[in-house]
Amino acid sequence: MNKRMIPTLVLALASMCGWAKDIVVSPAPYAIEQALQQAREERRLNGATDVTIRLQAGTYRLYQSVVVRPEDSGTHIIADKGAVVSGGVRITGWKKQGKVYVADVPEFNGRPLEFRQLWVNGVKADRARDVSDFEKMYRIRSVDKKTETLYVPAAAVKKIQNAKHAEMVLHEMWCVANLRIKGVKIKGDSAAVTFHQPESHIHFMHPWPSPMVTTDGHNSAFYLTNAKELLDQPGEWYLDAKAQKVYYIPRNGENMSTADVEVPAVETLVSVEGTPDNPVTGVTFEGVTFSYATWMRPSISGHAPLQAGMYMTEAYKLRPKTVRPNGDHKLDNQGWVGRPAAAVSVNAATNVDFLKCTFEHCASTGVEFHQYTKGGSIKRCTLSDLGGSGILAGSFGPEAHEAHQPYNPSDARIICTGLSIENNLVTDVTNEDWGCVGIGAGFVRDLRIVHNEISEVSYTGISMGWGWNQQACSMANNLVQSNLIHHYAKHMYDTAGIYTLGSQPHTTIEGNVVRDIYSPGYAHDPNHWFYLYTDEGSSCISVKNNWTPTDKYLKNANGPCNVWDNNGPEVADSIKAQAGIVKE
């Protein structure tokens, strides 16, 4: 046996009675899993009640998700500086072909490796696309829902008309859709573009959000990606999945003989997974860096989101509209949604904490507390360079639950309750799925989102609530306080620094600072942005003492008992100064 394949497990007896144990781990295959197993044995055989796994510096490369189970309750995983839990695979052996470098893609777990992201020396490279400046994106000309066809300028698609795996990323009000191109037919100065199933059917059936065709020049913009014909700029790459070759044009200063080129291979790096009756309890992650998680669903099924990155699995328009109770708008659409993957996922767990961790270089969500969770915290963490949302809290409804309906599960334990999200830096997230959010919460109770700084997001800073109706549901007692949100709405409008949906009794939004919104020229409505935005069904929410440069707010189809008080530039400087991360 190769001794280097065995993790170094140094067991230090902290008590003669065996109450506490330290397990020190160095990087090796399955090192973390073996340490967790060792900790279980210390509890089973020696009665240890307090076990710490210490990750020494280095990269812990995974073959699959690390699963933290109920048997691991009470474990503290603490990382030394430089300890990285990685789902990445390194690409080496680059050879120059003109201005392009090419390398073989290794197999992963005995299968061809496909990926949608690539990083060079920790900097995300661009999947080959037709424009480097998004302000120069082409716009669609018309939509034929019956034939599931988009008509676009012929010049936009001339390069990729014979490409087999090209994709269109289509700007649709508050979401972007990833549509795999099936066919391009050019006639004159126009081209008909069709798409693969299942996303084509879903995309052309659902009414909201929809591709825009207007009379004022704000037709939906789009860009094209994933075709070798588009590979022409430094920092761009293309994967030929069939040949298992990857092509890259280096940026200035990059030496491909020494560069660390990483692609993601594991979808969820760590899954904390209990059961409703036997939750994982009292687990802490401290100082751990989680990097290079993948999410391949858009390459398999496309991606047609409803909102906040939640992709539709079925959707269609209602004719006539459904009359709803309690003064809600008539409902003109139906939709069922799935949830994007997260690099770290927590389900059925009590008091799981992430302290001073880093979530970076991932395809989708950074960290989520999904369902059957109680307590727990995400504190003093950094979330950056993520394709999707930074943090997601709570369920957005099971996949069988229609998204516009109130959600009141008979087993209330399913609701994410008592989570604290405090003093985190969330920046450069949503850099791939522009419709995602900095921090997003679905059906939650007793949630605290306080003293975070959120910047460089494509859409909304903090989105809280779900359901588009004012009927009583499982949301209540949430707090959004003293957050600093700036440089948001980088790509999407119908947005706000802080946005709410649904009835949330005893919920407070207070003492936040929202400023510095982007002005993308391709937004569907250049005036439809806000600092604070209570959307459909928002009810029983107190919005007070929030500093914004002006009072540009929207209250759309709200329910009863909302209170707005003292918001705007007149808010006291002392309140304004308290927003954002509190120094230790």
Predicted regions and their residues:
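Right-handed parallel beta-helix
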Residues: 281-292, 330, 350-364, 373-388, ...
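Extracellular beta-rich repeat passengers
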Residues: 126, 130-132, 296, 511, ...
